[in-house]
Amino acid sequence: MVVPYNEELLNPASLDVTLGSTILVEVEHTPELQILDIGHYTQADPFWVTPGEFFLAETVEMFFMPANVGAQFVLKSSRAREGWDHAEAGWCDPSWTGSRLTMELKNGRRYHSLAIWPGMKIGQMKFVLVDQLPEVGYDKKGNYNGDSGVTASRGHL
């Protein structure tokens, strides 16, 4: 269901997820978000996100949700207490498969930048069993199935 699976990320009722090495950022005079590789940053030498800055990020983990399991992404409480905001659009439908989660993140601090780096624990997934299988799964009708990396909005589809 989650690849790579790391038992050290398992909590009593959730699974921690980690930040991948690619983000999409806003740049002046360009309406589309631009790809930024943060793969060379580390915890000791992080990428700094300025106050109020919004970006999309991917998880390292790839998800292969069965037809009877959904999941919800939430920030780790430590990250929220540091000042991170999440747009709460992290619902993963049953049958969402072969995809990395794209997270909508923002530095909610007023005066101080916040650090990110690949591999940092950013959030956790809460998994939910569904009672009935859907007639048509997300693998057949979803806009974001099979996304192997961070993905901008496909809301126009």
Named regions from a protein language model:
Residues 1-157:
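DUTPase catalytic domain/fold
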